[in-house]
C-alpha cells in the first residue's frame, strides 16, 4: 500500500517511505 505520513503527505510504498506510519 500506500501510506500517508502525518508530517508530510507522501503517497507511495511503505517500504520506500521512511516517514510513513503504517
Curated annotation (Swiss-Prot):
GO biological process: any one? defense response to fungus
Q: Which UniProt keywords apply?
A: Antibiotic, Antimicrobial, Fungicide, Plant defense
Q: Which InterPro entries match?
A: Scorpion_toxin-like_sf (IPR036574)
SUPFAM superfamilies per UniProt: Scorpion toxin-like
Going by the entry's taxonomy, the superkingdom of the source organism is recorded as Eukaryota
The UniProt function text for this chain reads: Antimicrobial peptide. Active against Gram-positive and Gram-negative bacterial pathogens.
Q: Give the family this protein belongs to, as stated in its UniProt record.
A: Belongs to the DEFL family. Group II subfamily.
Would you tell me the protein name for this molecule?
Answer: Defensin D1
Q: Which organism is it from?
A: Spinacia oleracea (Spinach)
At the highest ranks, the source species' classification is: Eukaryota, Viridiplantae, Streptophyta, Embryophyta, Tracheophyta
